């Protein structure tokens, strides 16, 4: 009788805490003064500041964008503009960011910080459903031309954004998907099942089985999946 092999169980090597997180951030490329100012403004003035991209993500994305020599990026979910600002700062003057959001409530602040940083000419803010913006880019013949896409918006829309982004990203480009651990709830069988968790679990399973891409789910911040398409 064939014996089944038990799943490999992995262990955390380091028990992370705030001291270790700050040590890691301090030993990475530092945020610019304008990035720090945007973070401080958001924490002090925006009730939902938890939605802000984390500092460790910013230095990581800067590295990815520069390794890719990226010139065309997409930011799905702008909030107060930190991720778009990070992408714009990481690229040369020819770099462009298509920034997708549905509301001006928070992006009105983003516009001010982008201008203050001198990168507003690099960022094209589209206030409409991201799915519409992505489809418009496809219809304009921009398939397989984008270097980097960051998805951090409504979780129930992630599957649509993933599929459209796969059409737009070039071979060798990277799609980064945020919040794929849902504060650890994805691995908790007793977690309260609600639409966001259902959507993220389904997408994680879909990407795992997706033969079109190479993928790695990293426990950075609230979890980031990095994807590059094979063909």
Curated annotation (Swiss-Prot):
**Positions annotated to bind a divalent metal cation:** 152, 178-179
Q: Name one Pfam family in it.
A: Methyltransf_3
Q: Does the record carry Nucleotide-binding as a key word?
A: no
Query: Its catalytic activity?
Result: (E)-caffeoyl-CoA + S-adenosyl-L-methionine = (E)-feruloyl-CoA + S-adenosyl-L-homocysteine + H(+)
Q: Which residues bind S-adenosyl-L-methionine?
A: 53, 75, 77-78, 83, 101, 130, 152, 154, 161
Q: Does the keyword Transferase apply?
A: yes
GO BP of this protein: methylation; response to bacterium
Family the entry assigns: Belongs to the class I-like SAM-binding methyltransferase superfamily. Cation-dependent O-methyltransferase family. CCoAMT subfamily.
Protein name (record): Probable caffeoyl-CoA O-methyltransferase 2
Source species of the chain: Dictyostelium discoideum (Social amoeba)
């Amino acid at each position: 009788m064939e014996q089944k092999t038990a799943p490999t169980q992995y262990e955390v090597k380091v028990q992370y805490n705030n001291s270790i997180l700050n040590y890691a951030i301090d030993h990475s490329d530092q945020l610019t003064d304008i990035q720090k100012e945007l973070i401080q403004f958001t924490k002090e003035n925006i009730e939902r500041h938890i939605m802000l991209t984390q500092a460790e993500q910013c230095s990581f994305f800067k590295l990815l964008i520069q390794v890719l020599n990226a010139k065309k990026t997409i930011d799905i979910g702008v909030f107060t503009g930190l991720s778009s600002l990070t992408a714009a700062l990481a690229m040369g003057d020819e770099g462009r960011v298509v920034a997708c959001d549905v509301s001006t409530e928070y992006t009105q602040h983003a516009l001010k910080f982008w201008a203050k940083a001198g990168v507003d000419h690099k960022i094209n803010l589209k206030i409409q459903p991201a799915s519409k913006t992505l489809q418009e880019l496809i219809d304009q013949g921009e398939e397989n031309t984008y270097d980097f896409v960051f998805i951090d918006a409504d979780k129930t829309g992630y599957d649509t954004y993933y599929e459209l982004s796969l059409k737009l990203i070039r071979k060798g480009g990277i799609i980064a998907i945020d919040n794929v651990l849902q504060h650890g709830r994805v691995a908790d069988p007793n977690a309260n099942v609600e639409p966001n968790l259902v959507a993220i679990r389904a997408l994680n399973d879909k990407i795992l089985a997706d033969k079109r891409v190479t993928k790695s789910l990293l426990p950075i911040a609230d979890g980031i999946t990095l994807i590059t398409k094979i063909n």
